């Protein structure tokens, strides 16, 4: 796998840990390009999808050997075969839609712009998510 131009390669990350930084740097997947998607399960798992073929592979990080010191483990990660760090398998994934560019709308409370799909209507005003007051009735 090589770096991704536009959205040719999509990564669905299930965590927000440092491994995501490597994916961005090495493979070129990013939130801004729309080909890095965050699905918060907290697992050390990453699914890579090729848009041209629909082929998807999910990597899941194996448990760390508790007997290894931190520095020893880091060195091990740099030198060992990928099979010792990750379980991986082909999987079926619904291809996510390509990133869309939304029109910006000005919040009628704070005056800041936000994409229209993130705006809310409250008391007849278009408001951003920061200014929106959730109605919960306390439960």
Enumerate the language-model features and the residues they cover.
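Long, hydrophobic N-terminal alpha-helical segment
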Residues: 1-3
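A structural-propensity feature for long, helix-poor, extended segments
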Residues: 6-41, 45-48
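Short Cys/His-rich Zn2+-coordinating modules
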Residues: 83-95, 109-114
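Short, flexible, mixed-charge glycine/proline-rich loop motifs
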Residues: 94-104, 117-122
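Short cysteine-rich clusters marking metal-coordination/redox-active sites
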Residues: 107-111, 128-131
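Short, non-ligating residues that shape and space the ligands of small metal-coordination modules
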Residues: 116-117, 137-138
């Amino acid at each position: 796998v090589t770096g991704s131009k536009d959205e040719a390669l999509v990564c669905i990350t299930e965590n927000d840990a440092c491994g995501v930084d490597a994916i961005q740097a090495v493979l070129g997947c990013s939130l801004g390009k729309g080909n890095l998607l965050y699905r918060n399960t907290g697992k050390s798992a990453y699914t890579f999808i090729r848009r041209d073929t629909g082929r998807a592979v999910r990597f899941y990080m194996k448990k760390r050997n508790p007997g290894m010191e931190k520095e020893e483990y880091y060195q091990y990660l740099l030198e060992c075969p990928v099979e010792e760090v990750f379980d991986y398998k082909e999987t079926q994934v619904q291809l996510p839609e390509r990133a869309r560019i939304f029109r910006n709308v000005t919040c009628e409370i704070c005056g800041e712009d936000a994409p229209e799909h993130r705006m809310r209507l409250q008391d007849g005003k278009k408001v951003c998510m920061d200014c929106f007051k959730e109605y919960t009735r306390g439960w």
